[in-house]
Amino acid sequence: MKRLSLAMVTLLACAGAQAASEKVEMNLVTAQGVGQSIGTVVIDETEGGLKFTPHLKALPPGEHGFHIHANGSCQPAIKDGKAVAAEAAGGHLDPQNTGKHEGPEGQGHLGDLPVLVVNNDGIASEPVTAPRLKSLDEVKDKALMIHVGGDNMSDQPKPLGGGGMRYACGVIK
């Protein structure tokens, strides 16, 4: 009986030690609305920060800006009198109101993630880690965004790393 009890305690302890994980469905976005799925990104809590593992297809090859945005919506919204893709997601997650784009290692936006790398076949599968984000609770009900073009992790020479328009989006539940 003692062995059975010890086995149950060990099993429960191991189950409780399992890190949290969330799968985010990613969809193309346009000024008209949310489009087709291009795959998923799995977010895992790790000792080194939140790890984002993409399982994505149909993306333009190269580097893309990759961010957590403040609002949990991928819908278009009006900006300067025009409908803009996924504008309802708001800006980069910045709970400290730093107003700075300094990348995942810097002290600016908390939503700044490492760039997403897409191979020549349009597939993204390389995980990236955001060391300043420790818990899924920090990103719950926020939007995960892929931008057209790269990100130099600076506000110079262009604001927000020079990334382009919003290309794909998913809501973190």
Curated annotation (Swiss-Prot):
- Tell me the PROSITE patterns matching this sequence: SOD_CU_ZN_2
Instruction: Identify its protein family.
Output: Belongs to the Cu-Zn superoxide dismutase family.
- One Pfam match: Sod_Cu
Q: Where in the cell is it found?
A: Periplasm
Reactions catalysed, semicolon-separated, are: 2 superoxide + 2 H(+) = H2O2 + O2
Task: Give yes or no: UniProt keyword Plastid.
Answer: no
According to its UniProt entry, this protein's organism is Salmonella typhimurium (strain LT2 / SGSC1412 / ATCC 700720)
Could you say which cofactors this protein requires? Cu cation; Zn(2+)
Subunit note: Monomer.
- Record-annotated disulphide pairs: 74-169
Its annotated function is as follows:
Destroys radicals which are normally produced within the cells and which are toxic to biological systems.
Which residues participate in Cu cation binding? 67, 69, 92, 147
Write down the superkingdom of origin.
Bacteria
Q: Which SUPFAM superfamilies match?
A: Cu,Zn superoxide dismutase-like
Residue positions annotated to bind Zn(2+) are 92, 101, 109, 112
Could you tell me the keywords of this UniProt record?
Answer: Antioxidant, Copper, Disulfide bond, Metal-binding, Oxidoreductase, Periplasm, Signal, Zinc
Q: Which named protein is this?
A: Superoxide dismutase [Cu-Zn] 2
Query: NCBIfam families under this entry?
Result: PRK10290.1
Which Enzyme Commission numbers does its entry carry? 1.15.1.1
Q: What class of enzyme is it?
A: oxidoreductase
Q: Name one GO molecular function term.
A: superoxide dismutase activity
- Report one GO cellular component: periplasmic space
- Keyword Metal-binding on this protein? yes
Signal peptide limits: 1-19
What GO biological process term is on the record, naming one?
removal of superoxide radicals
According to the record, cofactor stoichiometry and binding are noted as: Binds 1 copper ion per subunit. Binds 1 zinc ion per subunit.
